[in-house]
Each structure stands twice: as structure tokens, then as C-alpha cells.
Amino acid sequence: MPASPIRKLVPLAEAARARGTKIYHLNIGQPDLPSPQTGLDALKKIDRTGLEYSPSDGYRSLREKLVGYYEQFQIKLSPDDIIVTTGGSEAVLFAFMSCLNPGDEIIVPEPAYANYMAFAISAGAVIRPVVSSIEQGFALPDVAEFEKLINDRTRGILICNPNNPTGYLYTRKEMNRIRDLVKKYDLFLFSDEVYREFIYTGSPYISACHLEGIEQNVVLIDSVSKRYSECGIRIGALITKNRTLRNAVMKFCQARLSPPLIGQIVAEASIDAPRSYSTEVYEEYIERRKCLIDGLNRLPGVYSPIPMGAFYTVARLPVEDSDDFCAWCLSDFDYEGETVMLAPASGFYSDPACGRNEVRIAYVLKKEDLERALVVLGKALEAYNNRK
């Protein structure tokens, strides 16, 4: 089981904090913005004498509320197409466990969310990467690169759209090419779409559920964590119109009994948040994105493409080993009592050499803190490269 590139440096961060160093956390996608007041109010108003199990697929009232939410994005579902999970992570794990046998393979564009590898290992499956490049803005590689990897053990393709860690947004043309491949070889399409509300270019959001002819192949992964700043309530969803697959997933759901009761109450109420909440959050991330990307590309030797969605970027640094640099920032560096914590990009590739001089940066800090973090990062790079 690989260590998380997002969390593996935590012991060094704790030691730095114990020394009195202030850390700017650019390493993890933990939104710092308030959760919807509707959700917080629902939490405060819980008046129960017991906290019982919920149904294994989640409360129907929440699933009905989610149907209405997805309708805003032209995704037509019924409550029975939705299974509430303990975060989006459990949705990915249950999807893999239900669709893949040991030794089966899934094709994944990389860099990719690091925990996909851990979930594949848990299912006994093998990830076959198709590597995108920072020079091309992490655009989807040519479909021919996918087709080269397909064999009799290939069971699916996994995408994240908008992408974590790169912020790339798939075009309609790219999604149609994936659809054609899924249809041709009768593969599952696992589509992680938790960042759909964070698209900054005016480009359309193309869901896997919008693709005609593969309705039985699509497994949509979702979560309330990012759009409502509710990572801690651990509520996600696995969505499929494939009844055979749903029945298989439900066996895993029944084995873990139920998704979190209190989390479901908060999530259901959060869906009722006024549109102004989403608008304010969206506008804040637009400002942060501009601040971060402009600032990164002004630093000597640093390059970041402009992310189209989510709230991450993968940047190339003027270092040979970003793992070493990120650890050094916490163990051996501070500038005026401050340092930065980054996620080495090597952990987002199957072959760590692919991201050796790259880092993932999350812009989940207020603009003033991002500006200061960029100053500290610049000083860190200068000091690191001037070591004797």
C-alpha cells in the first residue's frame, strides 16, 4: 500500500509546528471556506434520543434531494440510481471491489488522485497508466495510447473531471473519444466528478452521464466534501443505472452497515443552500486561482499551466527531487518563522520518476495567505538551490 503523498509529510509538519514554525498548508484539498448555513443549522437542530443505523444505501430523502441537485446539470436520475457512501473514497473502493477481480486492469490518465492506487490495490486490481504532460497542460493523451493498453484483463477506464491533481477539464471531444472506447470494448467508465461546481473557463461540464450509449457502463463518483466544505461529514455517492452492479455494491454497503447518520442530515440540508452560497465560493476560488498561478509563474524556474477546474495545480519546480525539497521545507527551512507544505507529485504517478520535479498545490487558503506562501516558497527554492 503506497503512502499518501498528501499526508506522508505530516510527522515533519508536526515537528516544525512544535518548533514554533507557521506552516502554509498547500498540500491538501481541505477547503477553508464556511459550510452552508443550512447544513450547520441542521446540525445544531438535531433532536434525537438515539443515533440509529440508516438504510445501507442512505436515507431516501437524501437520495431524492440529490436527484434534484443533479437535474441542474442535466443528469437524469432516480433515487434508486444513487447509493450514499461514506465519502467519495468509499464509492471508488466499492466500485472497484464490485467490478474488478484480482488481476483485472483499469486504465487511468496520470497524474491521478493518489488514493486511486490504494483502492486498486485493495481490490487486487492493476492500474495501467496513460501519462499526460505538463507541457500539454495535462490534456488527455490520444485515445490510441489507451487502446494500446487494452487486453483481455482490461475492465475499465477511470477519469477525474475536473481533474485532481491537475485541474484539467475534459472537452466534449475527449469525452466522446472515451465513450467510443468504452462502448467498443464494453468497459466500465468510472468517473469522479466531485469538482463539477469549480469550472473557471466558461467551458461546459461534460459528465459521463451525458454520454449516450454507455448508460449501463458508467459509474459516477461524487461527494459533498468539496462543494460544501464538508470533508469531515464523510458523505459521498456512487451512481449507476446498472442494476447488476448496484446489487453487487449493496453487498459491500450492507457489510459496513450504513453511511454516517449525522453526515446525511447535514448533507441533505446543505443541498438547500441558496445559490448565492455557491456563487460566493466560486468567485473566491477564481480570485485564489489567479493569485496562485500568476505568482507561481513569476518565480524563477517555476512553471504551472492554468488549471481549468477544481482547486489544484501541478507545478514544475527548479529542483531535481520534489520529495526531498518538500521534506526539507519542513525539516530544515523557515523564512521569518514560516514555511510551506506541498504535496510531491511523484505520488500521483505509478512511476514516481514521472513527477520528480513537480508538486501539487491546493489553493484553499485566503488570498493574503497565498500571497505570503508564494513569497516563502520563492525563498525556499532560493535557499534549497544554494545549499553547499
Where does each model-flagged region fall?
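PLP-dependent class I/II
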Residues: 2, 9, 16-24, 28-45, ...
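P-loop/Walker A NTP-binding region and its immediately flanking N-terminal helices
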Residues: 48
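Generic structural signal for well-ordered alpha-helical scaffold segments
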Residues: 14, 67, 71, 96-97
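Conserved N-terminal alpha-helix of the aminotransferase class I/II PLP-enzyme fold
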Residues: 53-86
